[in-house]
Regions:
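S-adenosyl-L-methionine
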Residues: 1-153
Length: 153
């Protein structure tokens, strides 16, 4: 997890650990915000769609995603990451759901990255410089799966 952020889930009024959630340890030499921003990029999403089962985001996949040190140290990515995470928080919705099948009440936060696309695009534009993408490659990344990602649910 980035910056020791933890998902908070209440089940029947009791705080519970989310079993599927795994922690990502980041070396102190790296900036947590920039790593979080890069993992929130469309570039990372495209790689996730292209190279995984599209269901399980594994620690191994994250560990093997190539991130240039220059991108981790880029102040623009750090600033865009801070703006992105603040926007995620501003747009989140807390849900309180009763599951009849289990008889349990669950409270959780839902996040809507499509509402923060301007920040994600800015991160991808900066990343394109670090990965030496052409304009066409950057355009492909920014617009990848756009209809699905930005459409109404």
């Amino acid at each position: 997890m980035i910056k020791n952020q933890k998902s908070i889930t209440f089940i029947n009024g009791v705080l519970e650990d989310v079993k599927a959630e795994k922690e990502i340890k980041i070396d102190d030499a790296y900036n947590n915000t920039s790593i979080g921003a890069i993992l929130s990029s469309t570039l990372f999403y495209w790689n996730y769609i292209a190279f995984t089962d599209c269901r399980n985001l594994t620690k191994g996949f994250i560990d093997n995603f190539p991130i240039p040190l220059s991108a981790v140290e880029d102040k623009i990515i750090v600033n865009d990451g801070n703006a992105l995470f603040a926007d995620y928080e501003a747009n989140k919705r807390t849900k309180d759901t009763y599951y009849q099948s289990t008889g349990r009440n669950v409270v959780y936060d839902e996040y809507y990255p499509k509402l923060s696309k301007q920040y994600i695009d800015s991160i991808d534009i900066t990343l394109a410089k670090h990965y030496c993408f052409t304009k066409e490659e950057l355009d492909f990344i920014i617009n990848y799966d756009i209809k699905y990602r930005m459409g109404d649910e």
